[in-house]
Amino acid sequence: MAIEVHGVCPYFEVYDMPNSIRFYRDHLGFEIVSTSPHRGGDKDRFHWCWLRLGTAEIMLNTAYEIDEERPPLENYLRERKHRDTCLYFGCPDVDGAYAELVAKGVVVDRPPTVAPYGMKQMYLHDPDGFGLCFQWKAV
C-alpha cells in the first residue's frame, strides 16, 4: 500500500515574524491560513503561522520564542547555514511575476532566464535568506 500524500508544507524559522509576514503576504501574495495567538498590539506578531498561495503552503516560526533572547541583529552564521535551501514554485507566468515583484520593490537575485534544462526561472531570497525560485517550462 502506498502512503497517500496531498502536499508538502516546508517549515522555516524566521528572525523577525512581522517582517517575514509582510514579505510573504504583501509582496508575494500568500494568505494567512492560521497562526498561534497574537502577541502584543501588532497584528503580525505571533510565534507561528501557516501561509498559502494557490496550492503552495509554508509554515513560519520565530527562531526566538522570547523577544529578549533575540539578538539585535540577524545572526549571519544562522542565515549562511540555510543559504542552499530553495523552494521551487510552479508559476506559469514567470515574466508577469517578475514585473509585479519589481514594481513592489522586491529585490530579485536573478531575473527570468531559461536554464539549459528548459525551465524559465527567477530567483530571489526572503528576509531570512531562504531561496525562492518561480519557474515554468520554457516554450
Where are these regions (language model features)?
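Vicinal oxygen chelate
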Residues: 1-3, 47, 89, 98-139
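Short amphipathic alpha-helices within nucleic acid-binding modules
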Residues: 22-23, 95-100
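Short, P/G- and charge-enriched loop/turn segments at secondary-structure junctions
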Residues: 72-78
